[in-house]
Amino acid sequence: MVSVARLVFMLGPLLCLGAQLSSSQHWSHGWYPGGKRELDSFTTSEISEGIKLCEAEGCSYLRPQRRNILKNVILDALAREFQKRK
């Protein structure tokens, strides 16, 4: 029982100190609890030029690239295996 009390005594201040030092979200600056943001606060100036350009033409960076990465990893592994066999 003494070790449990000692553990609580040590973890309590450590938890309080960790909460103070962490970079948690502050609810001022237009944010509400739960990560919600006021929708009316967005202005047209917050839309980046890259997104405006992508509306006119297709943007490849908006498409998921996971398939290409996986394909490249598999091809590299096969190429290494082929080089080992030579």
Curated annotation (Swiss-Prot):
GO cellular component, one term: extracellular space
Protein name in UniProt: Progonadoliberin-2
Subcellular location: Secreted
PANTHER family: GONADOLIBERIN, PROGONADOLIBERIN
Function, as annotated: Stimulates the secretion of gonadotropins.
Keywords for this protein: Amidation, Cleavage on pair of basic residues, Hormone, Pyrrolidone carboxylic acid, Secreted, Signal
Protein species of origin: Oncorhynchus mykiss
Family membership: Belongs to the GnRH family.
An annotated Gene Ontology molecular function: gonadotropin-releasing hormone receptor binding
Gene: gnrh2
Pfam families in UniProt: GnRH
Signal peptide as annotated in the record: 1-24
Stretches of the chain forming a coiled coil according to its record: none
Modified-residue entries (Pyrrolidone carboxylic acid), positions: Q25
Modified residues (Glycine amide): G34
This protein's record includes keyword Signal: yes
Secreted among keywords: yes
